[in-house]
């Protein structure tokens, strides 16, 4: 099995990259892909860059060039669920765009023409992630993760997301674009991210302060998940 892993930022991939044995670096379309073995398992780790376009471009290049069997999207996210705090884990059962609006033509808010309203994560990957969470004794929430090209840092943006997606547990900037590409390629995916901030008026301050905490937690989760997927 070859496992594809996608993170947007240097801080979100550096700990995993340093653990890859026999590492080789491929630069394509402004993205960097690191291939090798993570604890004996073949992996391809992509640093995509921030935002939906960068994430979709990178995911497409990763799938075409490295042919992974599954995709894990990792990194940080802003917490929306009331039980979440910095360092906690969110696992997607579905992802949706929070900044797409074609409702004038009868589509659901967040749905693009020709696409499902949301992109469902793979049940087996979800189950494996939840098993890792239990083993690591981490606090986690599974649910809807929403994505858009905006860092949510204020009451207006937050209120709009809560109105349109009252069940959303986290918000970030890449996951749905990655899920969209995986859907088109028919490749199983799951989002496993750690909370770096709560999406409020101080989120930009807590993000800068706690990104390293989120990166450490998400790296631990992904490393454990890769082991479980490879060896059961």
Swiss-Prot record:
Keywords linked to the UniProt accession: Amino-acid biosynthesis, Hydrolase, Methionine biosynthesis
The protein's Enzyme Commission number: 3.2.2.9
Broad enzyme group: hydrolase
Gene Ontology terms describing biological process: L-methionine salvage from methylthioadenosine; L-methionine salvage from S-adenosylmethionine; purine deoxyribonucleoside catabolic process
Active site: 12, 197
InterPro entries documented for this protein: MTA_SAH_Nsdase (IPR010049), Nucleoside_phosphorylase_d (IPR000845), Nucleoside_phosphorylase_sf (IPR035994)
Catalytic activity, reaction form: S-adenosyl-L-homocysteine + H2O = S-(5-deoxy-D-ribos-5-yl)-L-homocysteine + adenine; S-methyl-5'-thioadenosine + H2O = 5-(methylsulfanyl)-D-ribose + adenine; 5'-deoxyadenosine + H2O = 5-deoxy-D-ribose + adenine
Pfam families: PNP_UDP_1 (PF01048)
SUPFAM superfamilies noted in UniProt: Purine and uridine phosphorylases
GO cellular component, one term: cytosol
GO molecular function per UniProt: adenosylhomocysteine nucleosidase activity; methylthioadenosine nucleosidase activity
Subunit structure as annotated in this protein's UniProt entry: Homodimer.
Protein family: Belongs to the PNP/UDP phosphorylase family. MtnN subfamily.
Job of this protein: Catalyzes the irreversible cleavage of the glycosidic bond in both 5'-methylthioadenosine (MTA) and S-adenosylhomocysteine (SAH/AdoHcy) to adenine and the corresponding thioribose, 5'-methylthioribose and S-ribosylhomocysteine, respectively. Also cleaves 5'-deoxyadenosine, a toxic by-product of radical S-adenosylmethionine (SAM) enzymes, into 5-deoxyribose and adenine. Thus, is required for in vivo function of the radical SAM enzymes biotin synthase and lipoic acid synthase, that are inhibited by 5'-deoxyadenosine accumulation.
Protein name: 5'-methylthioadenosine/S-adenosylhomocysteine nucleosidase
Organism field: Salmonella paratyphi C (strain RKS4594)
